[in-house]
Amino acid sequence: MKLLKPALYCTPLPQEISTQLLMRACGSAHLALVDYNLYLSTYILYDKRMTSISLKTAEDIAGMRVAGRLGSEVLDYITPFVKAGTTTGEIDRLCHEYMLNVQGSIPAPLNYCPPGYTPYPKAICTSVNDVICHGIPGDKILKNGDVVNLDITVIKNGYHGDNSRMFLIGEPSILAKRLSEITYECMWLGISMVKPGNYLGDIGHIIQQHAEKSGYSVVREFCGHGIGTVFHEEPQVLHYGRPGTLTKLEAGMIFTIEPMINAGRREIREMGDGWTIKTKDRSLSAQWEHTVLVTETGYEVLTLSAGSPPPPAFITPA
């Protein structure tokens, strides 16, 4: 998502979270607790929008490895529950409780409120069928044949771990299965271009080429992003473009690669809740996401865990 101004979090603290847990999860440098008498248990986090790309320190990278693994482990945990008959709201509740009670992390999306938006009301995003991104969990019951993207971002010790996976419910259609597979390949092809000296345009180009030669389209309005102690920072990582253009990659950069690929046309429509984005032609959409570090010789995927799907066979390990 493109964020051009500082974003504000303003979140009621759940009763089960202690101030000490919150401080450990967020990092005291990024936390301001407000008057309990006036605001009850409300905290405010400022997403300090950076105007330049930050190269992460060794300490930052260590923190991002922890947060990334935890983000992926939430997806491992929830996998058995993502099935026909389960509501997206129940999936959100289970993920939220796992973050708080097992990991000691907190969900970054909860009440995330960039300029022009209303606060996001849930802990995760659940995007079903023709929902491209930012689907809000609720009463929707998953049914056989559905496709759903679960987008998870945790905060641990002030660092963000951001990733998403596709889930196919029951017996998916051939179209749904192929769309998910091609989108997964698009993400990994983009990742394979990450190394010092390459360009952001190289990432976008290879994703666009693979999607379009497969008969699909790439969403333009939303993109990957830099990430660290800030949820969304520079650079913006487009999933389309020309090779050899945009920012040159340097060791120490960390950003997400999260292509949104539509089975039909690329145009979007915004829903009335202020968050949910759907395909304009009501075609299926898919998305996969990893957080990636640029190393001295290539890349390191930070959002891997025991349950992560393996890379496609044609991807050469970094």
Annotate each predicted stretch with a short phrase.
Residues 22, 30-32, 45:
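Low-complexity, intrinsically disordered segments with a bias for serine/threonine
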Residues 2-5, 16, 35-37, 47-48:
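Intrinsically disordered, low-complexity polyampholyte segments enriched for Lys and acidic residues
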